[in-house]
Regions:
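Divalent-metal (often Zn2+) His-rich catalytic cores of metallo-beta-lactamase-fold enzymes
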Residues: 147-161
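Active-site beta-loop-alpha junctions enriched in small/polar residues
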Residues: 81, 150-152, 181-187
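Alpha-helical scaffold segments that flank or form the walls of functional sites
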Residues: 39, 69-71, 88-147, 163-170
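Histidine/acidic residue-rich metal-binding segments in metalloenzymes
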Residues: 157-178
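Histidine-rich, glycine-flanked metal-binding segment
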Residues: 14-71
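Solvent-exposed loop/turn tips at the surfaces of repeat/solenoid architectures
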Residues: 7-8, 42
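Hydrophobic faces of well-ordered beta-strands that scaffold small-molecule active sites
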Residues: 76-78, 145-147, 176-180
Length: 188
């Protein structure tokens, strides 16, 4: 089934000018179509004005009137560590007060705090926390994430974290690829 969003007050687009992606200053070139329309099924098939959309064959197309609404691309977060346990909020307060990361780590804090909490947590506990964070990201406009491990610091815990990353729901699994290690680096 295809859907046509039409009469969009502000349709925000990315002007890639035919490029597969854009970076740097080119990212400031944001387009806007007023009174826009967008046709999509599994992928975006057409973007233009609501007036131009009247030329589209709407047989078997669900039409949604978006009068007064803004439509924009979703955010992409390509580096998350959503599978974790514990909190280091108290360390943030110390950092704001002037403590260095090295000082906090020397006292057993830093990543070691998270490592211990992750190792002690069950897969179900880690999954519940990751699910909560993933749903929050989705509610705030992030449509694609990559979930990385990294807090286990040993093979067994890293594998546990990667398994949890594949359990979370809310995105299709192609949008939540686990990334076990940097390509070319040896696994231990």
């Amino acid at each position: 089934m295809k859907t046509l969003l039409t009469n969009i007050a502000s349709l925000v687009t990315v002007r890639a000018h035919g490029a597969p992606f854009i970076t740097g200053e080119a990212m400031r070139d944001v387009g806007e179509i007023t009174q826009g329309a967008i046709l999509f099924g599994d992928t975006i098939e057409w973007v233009g004005t609501a007036e131009e959309a009247m030329q589209i064959d709407l047989t078997d197309v669900d039409v949604v009137d978006c009068t007064g609404k803004t439509v924009m691309p979703g955010f992409v977060d390509s580096h998350t560590h959503m599978v974790f346990a514990g909190t280091r909020a108290h360390e943030f307060a110390r950092r704001v007060a002037g403590a260095t990361y090295a000082e906090i780590a020397a006292e057993g804090g830093g990543i070691l705090t998270t490592m211990k909490a992750v190792r002690q947590a069950t897969e179900d506990e880690l999954a519940a926390n990751a699910q909560r964070l993933l749903q929050s990201a989705l509610r705030h406009g992030t449509t694609t994430v990559e979930i990385k491990s990294g807090y286990g610091l040993d093979t067994e815990t890293e594998v546990k974290m990667l398994k949890v990353g594949t359990r979370v729901q809310g995105y299709n699994q192609e949008s939540v690829p686990p990334h076990p290690r940097t390509p070319g680096t040896p696994s231990t």
